[in-house]
Swiss-Prot record:
It comes from Mus musculus (Mouse). This is Protein kintoun. Residues 388-404 have a biased composition (Basic and acidic residues). The keyword Zinc does not apply. Required for cytoplasmic pre-assembly of axonemal dyneins, thereby playing a central role in motility in cilia and flagella. Involved in pre-assembly of dynein arm complexes in the cytoplasm before intraflagellar transport loads them for the ciliary compartment.
């Protein structure tokens, strides 16, 4: 704004390319430069200027106008600011052609004592722009009084104040600008800029003189410039009485400088991924406040103070005072200020306190509380602090809720013993944490419990084998009952909150919680932070949610307030790690309350390696010793690793040949042969144990265990796995019988026919019938070089898989 206002008039000059080229070539010609120099000297010659004024005076007299050139004589200079943007100078000058100041006695205004009322005639010239030494532009105005007025000003201080106030007021009223009267200062110089004569035009008493007889009329009428000339019969020649000069009033208040506030955001490409948790925050990272101080030479005279959402600036000589209310609370301890002397601007950069900014509830309109109170859509609950949070939503207030419930330390042993299974939702939300598939040894399937809170949407199949669990229709009916109770049905008084679908991502210094619940009411979102845990409760229009998070004792959270961002589809909460706990954590615990915490693992290399060791190293040994299989890596990409495993012949080939068909080393079985062999020789199919294909999805938490022929290639993709799944002897979840170790060894392994698989996307099918088979140790890996065909057998093999972004197109375009 300031730059646009101070721009030169040459910026409006519209020249074509041809005209620019002509000017360039002309000024490169020495003859043209000589002629141009002579022209400049001619128009600046005082004698030529005098002749020019005489000719203009004679021409205007012929048109009935008396023209007098007013040459300003130096007096004193006032320095101030123009519209709060750049400097301005007012030359208080004198000339004998201006009227003499006069006074008359009269009563004072407002009942004050009698005094003198002065009349100060003046002549005002248009402003002129000049460029300073550093390129900054300033404006100069000339206000011309009679020499007697300046003489009185030099001898009387109060008269001088009145004269200066009259000059400033004349410039403001005539040109429609705003001058800083409070900080107007008298300089030691007598004149600023190059003197330019002004013109006084007054109509002649007789009007336009008659045209001499015999002189032919002109071909063209007189132009109306610069104004309409008075008629000959006009008698309105009396001058109107001059308005009384302003009295010497009290010193005005300090000037409020112009300022602008810019919200600065940091662009991060990961906020523009194709994922629900990737969204730019509406709260800016910094506020940049630019304050225009055109009269301030040094910041030593200014005092700046920032408190919360208020910025205060005070200055003496020049007098500035600013009280600016900021849109967000800022961290004044990390702010910085810089003064640009060239532009006379103070730039203050203030980081936004994200925790304080996001804790403030949005200002509710007057209609919102009435609608919420009338409909009463929010379900009521009698569960402690959650009920208080729900009351805040119904009343539309932001009062703090009641006492927080205590959070106990997580007990991994208890989590294993209870064996509650809380699956993640079926949708793929791009998380990097998994929930362990806890199949404990000492707990029967009938003793395992699964609360309804494990199903946030009500459309996930039951994970327990009990026939009394809720079906999809029953869960849908339960949701309708919940909505009915929220509407105030007399049959129900309250409902219990449920655990929301939650995902947790981590980096070196923070945790990001993604709450996949649409329509969250921001005013009901409350959290309680502790070094080892975090409690959260919130509600929507028709349901309530509550959850408790715990972490290992060695993993501590920072006491800094969490960063919260609520959208229409979800909510994101960022928890900072304590400085001594920076790094990647292994596990976290989540549940409805501290009694129902369940362990969940983060996706990292340590957890993946541990799970592979559990899967590939079975605790039971096969009755018949098999030769270690050969593992061949077929394909290794950023997204998946494809492995082909072949079982070698047994060391006692006679035993297998007596049963029927032998296992051909290095030759995979066709589907027909595999089906025939499994139908005719169950023992042979038992000896050829199926190899499981483990798929690890980085976008979800489901496990896909796929059983098939040993010759089928096995794929290890980037999906998260369940490291806690114990590869115990097989058992059926419907049965609650507990077997001993000896009995487990004698259980016959069922034969999995072609096409059978247990899909990890449906946890109910996995847990209702969980089949775990003995897998021989994979001691060697046969790797084939795709270029020269050479084969290399590796016994100690380590694989590192690179990560890939979900939407690499954004990075390719960058």
């Amino acid at each position: 704004m300031a730059k646009a206002a101070a721009s030169s008039a040459l910026e409006d000059l519209d020249l074509s390319r041809e005209e620019v080229q002509r000017f360039t070539s002309a000024f490169q010609d020495p003859e043209f430069r000589r002629m141009f120099s002579e022209y400049a000297a001619e128009i600046t010659d005082p004698e030529n200027r005098r002749r020019y004024e005489e000719e203009i005076t004679a021409l205007e007299r012929e048109r009935g106008v008396d023209v007098r050139f007013v040459h300003p004589e130096p007096g004193h200079v006032l320095r101030t600011s123009l519209d709060g943007e750049h400097r301005c100078y007012v030359n208080v000058c004198s000339n004998s052609l201006v009227g003499v100041p006069s006074s008359r006695p009269g009563p004072g205004r407002g009942g004050t004592a009698a005094g003198s009322h002065w009349s100060l005639p003046y002549s005002l010239a248009p402003g002129r722009q000049y460029a300073g030494r550093n390129g900054a532009r300033y404006t100069v105005y000339d206000v011309v009084f009679h020499p007697e007025a300046l003489a009185l000003a030099r001898s009387h201080e109060r008269f001088r104040e009145m004269l200066d106030a009259t000059a400033l007021e004349a410039v403001e009223q005539q040109f429609g600008v705003r001058l800083d009267r409070r900080n107007a200062k008298t300089l030691k110089i007598k004149y600023k800029g190059m003197p330019e004569a002004a013109v006084l035009r007054t109509p002649l008493p007789g009007g336009v003189p008659a045209q001499p007889e015999g002189e032919p009329p002109g071909l063209f009428p007189d132009p109306p410039y610069p104004y309409r000339y008075p008629a000959a019969a006009a008698a309105n020649t009396a001058r109107s009485p001059a308005s009384p000069a302003p009295e010497a009033v009290q010193r005005p208040e300090p000037t409020e400088p112009r300022c602008s506030v810019v919200q600065r955001h940091h662009v991060d490409l990961q906020d523009y991924r194709c994922s629900r948790d990737a969204a730019p925050s509406t709260v800016p990272h910094e506020l940049v406040v630019t304050i225009e101080l055109p009269l301030l030479r040094s910041v030593e005279r200014a005092e700046l103070e920032v408190k919360g959402k208020l910025l205060c600036l005070d200055s003496r000589n020049p007098d500035y005072r600013l009280r600016l209310s900021l849109p967000y609370p800022v961290d004044d301890g990390r702010g910085k200020a810089q003064y640009n002397k060239a532009r006379r601007q103070l730039v203050v950069t203030l980081p936004v306190a994200l925790a304080d900014a996001r804790q403030e509830p949005p200002a509710a309109t007057p209609e919102e509380p009435a609608e919420e109170t009338g409909t009463d859509d929010v379900a009521r609950t009698s569960a402690g602090d959650f009920a208080a949070a729900r009351e805040e939503s119904a009343d539309g207030t932001g009062a703090d809720h009641g006492e927080k419930s205590g959070v106990g330390a997580p007990d991994p042993g208890a989590a294993h013993a209870e064996g509650e299974l809380v699956p993640e939702p079926e949708q793929d939300f791009g998380g990097d944490s998994v929930a362990p598939l806890d199949l404990g040894k000492g707990t029967s399937p009938g003793d395992r419990s699964l609360p309804y809170s494990a199903f946030p949407g009500g459309d996930t199949e039951s994970l327990c084998g009990d026939p009394g669990v809720q079906t999809n229709e029953e869960q849908e009916r339960t949701r309708h009952d919940t909505a009915g109770s929220a509407m105030g049905d007399p049959g129900t008084e309250s409902i219990a909150p449920v655990c929301p679908p939650l995902q947790c991502n981590q980096d070196e210094d923070s945790l990001t919680l993604l709450i996949q619940v649409p329509g969250i009411l921001p005013q009901t979102l409350h959290g309680h932070l502790s070094p080892v845990g975090y409690e959260l409760c919130f509600s929507t229009q028709d349901s309530g949610y509550s959850c408790t998070l715990q972490f290992a004792p060695e993993n501590k959270l920072s006491t800094r307030e969490p960063e919260t961002s609520v959208s229409l589809n979800n909510a994101v909460i960022v928890l900072a790690k304590s400085p001594e706990s920076h790094g990647l954590w292994r596990e976290w615990y989540c549940g409805l309350n501290k009694e129902s915490l369940e362990e969940r693992l983060f996706i990292n290399e340590e957890n993946v390696n541990g799970f592979l060791e559990e899967v590939l190293c079975s605790p039971l040994k096969q009755a018949r010793s098999l030769a270690p299989p050969l593992i061949e890596v077929l394909q290794a990409t950023d997204e998946q690793v494809q492995i082909h495993a072949e079982l070698q012949e047994c060391s006692d080939p006679a035993g297998l040949q007596g049963k029927g068909k032998g296992v051909r080393e290095g030759c995979p079985l066709s589907e027909a042969e595999a089906a025939d062999q499994s139908a005719t020789s169950p023992a042979a199919s038992d000896s050829a144990a199926a190899v499981e294909a483990l798929k690890i999805n980085t976008h979800g938490s489901a496990v896909d265990l796929q059983h098939g022929c040993p010759e089928v290639p096995h794929v290890l993709s980037g999906k998260p796995l369940q490291p806690e799944a114990k590869m115990d002897p097989e058992f059926i979840r419907e049965s609650s019988t507990t077997y001993s170790t000896e009995e487990k060894e004698n259980i016959r392994e069922p034969v999995i026919s072609k096409g059978e698989k247990i899909n990890g996307d449906h946890p109910s099918s996995l847990l209702n019938k969980t089949v775990v088979q003995n897998i021989p140790d994979f001691d060697t890996i046969k790797e084939t070089n795709m270029q020269d065909g050479s084969v290399q057998i590796i016994r100690d093999h380590t694989t590192h898989c690179a990560f890939s972004f979900q939407n690499p197109l954004l990075y390719d375009l960058d």
